Regions:
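Alpha-helical hairpins and coiled-coil heptad-repeat segments
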Residues: 250-267, 459-477
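Acidic, low-complexity, intrinsically disordered peripheral segments
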Residues: 302-303, 317-319, 323, 469, ...
Length: 523
């Protein structure tokens, strides 16, 4: 007798094994007519029950709201500055490997090492693996659970207790051999398990975008630390150049003092200027060491591991004439934090369905098939057969409001996730607008400081010549020299700031993870 007679062959082949309980005949036993009639009657009942349950399972609804991608505030175009600088942001496809637009081989090499060896990225990958394992645990509920069992024991029952099923009435011990298979499967009529799987998928997407967000931070921090390092080295070079000028002025004042055309005050002021400039160098050396250590940490290396590689001076990486930043409509798909907020909202929506599913009855199909005998020679015979099959139903009746409280909690969490999504999108627009403004303003400041440096250089040469001619005193030379040093350092800092602003812009745009953790292969 086949369990699924009356159901479609597809149902029978896909959803459960075919059991021939009533047509199996042991070679050493005869059929029992009473058993066959009982089996036939029970078989028809099982046919009806199984087919009804399976049809209900396959046509079941899914409780709870379906997730719809939220609509957030959008802008049609990027903001444009009133006074545009030389390098402009353009709405063209953004380079996925944006750090290469600096055309600095050292920066490109360091970035590649960070992608491979950074410990924060490895931690994020570990968290992603945990999320995948958690999803596997949850999705396993969609499938039947099967197990094989087997046992042997020697027993003796009490002769003074309840009826002894062994037939020995407690007079002697007996053996018991038992083995078989068992299976159970929760029929997901209301879609509770499907909603759990949906929430697990969304939670996994949260972890995926968390990894992308960590990657984006590592990329930006590597570029920022490297650019700052080159900026500090250029500032030190400018300081050393000014130190040479100050020493030359000191030597000049000493010669003039020997000739009787200068005073001790001129020499003292020149010496003080030399000492003041020299005092700036230790702080710059310390800052260089800190930045090299910061890069070493990003590479997963011990302190000073990159000192020999990075201690040699190099120019600050320069920005290109045009910076491709993509279209505003691409932002939601590119920024990991927006994708993460959307996934959290998706998971919160699915969890409402899980909470609603708990109000409905749970129906589980369970069964077992095996053999049990007190003599090993009887094990496997027709008379040793044992089986059980049927549905189990669990329906919550009274729980003191716990289920209602859980549902209210899930709905409130969904509202929070929806607001968080809107806030994340709005914050992204503000960050990009601020970075666009900062990128343009930093260029204008750099260009103005470049002109200030040029004019101060002219002023210093003029002051030195006039001092030699006796037209002005040495205070004028020191004043102009101090102004030149200040403007030169400000120019180096502003030039560094332009490159840092571009890194901040790319970080705000959310680009850089596509080529490392693409969507199509990550899961």
């Amino acid at each position: 007798m086949k369990i699924f007679v009356g159901c479609s062959d597809a149902f029978a082949s896909k959803l459960a094994p075919t059991l021939d309980l009533c047509t199996t005949q042991n070679s050493h036993s005869k059929r029992d007519p009473l058993w066959e009639r009982a089996c036939s009657r029970r078989g028809r009942q099982l046919h009806f029950t199984f087919c009804a349950l399976l049809v209900m399972s396959l046509t079941a609804c899914t409780v709870g709201p379906d997730f719809k991608k939220p609509e957030a505030q959008q802008i049609s175009e990027w903001s444009k500055p009133h006074n545009a600088a030389a390098s402009q942001a353009v709405a063209q496809d953004m380079d996925e490997r944006w750090w290469e637009v600096f055309r600095d081989p050292q920066l490109t090499a360091l970035t590649q090492r960070a992608l491979t060896d950074n410990l924060d990225l490895k931690l994020a990958s570990s968290r992603l693996q945990q999320s995948r394992a958690a999803r596997q645990v949850i999705t396993a509920e969609r499938y039947p659970n099967t197990a094989a069992t087997g046992s042997y024991g020697r027993k003796r029952n009490s002769g003074e207790g309840l009826s002894d099923p062994s037939g020995h009435d407690g007079n002697s011990a007996f053996n018991l051999w038992d083995a078989g298979f068992s299976a159970s499967w929760e029929l997901d009529f209301w879609g509770r398990v499907r909603r759990e799987t949906e929430a697990a998928d969304a939670t996994l997407e949260v972890a995926e975008n968390d990894q992308r967000g960590v990657l984006l931070s590592v990329l930006a921090e590597t570029a920022q630390d490297y650019i700052q390092l080159r900026g500090v080295q250029n500032t030190r070079a400018v300081t050393e150049q000014n130190l040479d000028v100050a020493r030359h002025s000191l030597k000049l004042s000493q010669l003039r003092l020997a000739d009787g055309v200068a005073t001790d005050l001129d020499v003292a002021e020149a010496a003080a200027q030399v000492a003041a400039i020299e005092s700036r160098l230790p702080a710059l050396e310390q800052r260089q060491a800190q930045l090299i250590n910061a890069l070493s940490l990003l590479m997963g290396e011990p302190p000073q591991a990159l000192h020999a590689e990075l201690s040699t001076d190099a120019p600050v990486p320069q920005t290109p004439r045009q910076v491709a930043i993509g279209l505003p409509s691409q932002l939601a798909e590119r920024r990991p934090d927006i994708r993460q907020a959307e996934a959290r909202l998706h998971a919160a929506t699915a969890n409402i369905g899980v909470a609603k599913g708990d109000f409905y009855p749970r129906i589980t199909l369970s069964g077992n098939l095996g053999s049990q005998a007190m003599q090993l020679s009887d094990y496997g015979s027709w008379g040793s057969r044992a089986f059980g099959i049927g549905p189990q139903l669990s329906l919550p009746l009274f729980d003191g409001g716990r289920l209602r409280g859980v549902l209210n909690l899930r709905e409130a969490q969904q509202q929070e996730a929806a607001i968080a999504y809107q806030h994340t999108v709005l914050r992204a627009w503000h960050e990009i607008d601020d970075q666009l403004s900062a990128y343009n303003a930093s260029q204008l400041r750099r260009d103005s400081l470049a002109e200030a440096v040029r004019q101060n250089q002219i002023a210093l040469r003029t002051a030195q010549q006039q001092y030699v001619e006796g037209v002005v005193d040495f205070v004028n030379v020191l004043t102009v020299q101090g102004e030149l040093l200040a403007t030169q350092q400000q120019w180096v800092e502003s030039s560094t700031g332009v490159s840092l602003a571009m890194v901040g812009l790319y970080k705000a745009l959310g680009g850089g993870w596509e080529s490392v953790y693409p969507i199509s292969v990550q899961r």
